[in-house]
Amino acid sequence: MPHLHLEYTANLTGLAVEKTLLRLNNVLMVSGQFASELDIKSRAVKVESYQVGTSLNARGFIAVKLSLLSGRSPQVKQQLSQSLLAALQDAGDWPEGVQVQLSVQLVDMDRDSYSKVAIG
């Protein structure tokens, strides 16, 4: 735990996805909130079909959802959100003429019902 889900629009061709995931994992690790780097799992999905607003102008987004085991304070969650957002801002060569929206959402996972096993 945690699980980081990153969705990004296909028009963000300059985004180095693997590098961005590693950067976000490092942000989480240095926060001191997670016991081991092995606990952090991240993945990215390129969104081919999307619409931002109603305009036909070029727009895109990166949306990060971080799922955490419940029990962290609002202050800790806010710090994690702001740190991830700051790292996203430095993530890529943003395409000329494309308005890009970046967002981070933290979601609590029920600690009592979460199960995990490591094999190997």
Question: Predicted regions span which residues?
Answer:
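A domain-level signal for the structural core that forms small-molecule/cofactor-binding pockets
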Residues: 2-120
